[in-house]
Amino acid sequence: EEYLSRVNRILTAAEQHHVQVIWMGIPYMKQAKLNKQMRYLDKLLADEISPKALWIPTDKLLSNGSDTYADSVNINGKIIRYRSKDGIHFSAEGQKLLADKIMEKIVFQTTPEMNGEERTEQLSAR
């Protein structure tokens, strides 16, 4: 409950400042006990955040679509490691995948300037 209260404070502050929030879910974890805890937390967060912000689930994204932890995926016959050996953190390739998923959701809009030039200024989430 305290954790969700903190999450809501962040979302409220963002709303007050007219800032859109993109929140990424929690991926599967290698260690079973930690994974069980994180699945519970991920569900709580998704239920709380989805109506108020853009929620990007990461569990299946980082596990090649399966319902279990995977540190690597096979892409066109090439093994790509997305997770570090600790089963928690991300490799550089995993970080890039997550960044790409965030960028897919951002819409860059141009606004006209007084001198006729356009400037990219506003961001909005899809």
Feature roles, as predicted:
Residues 110-126:
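Compositionally biased, proline/threonine/alanine/serine-rich low-complexity intrinsically disordered stretches
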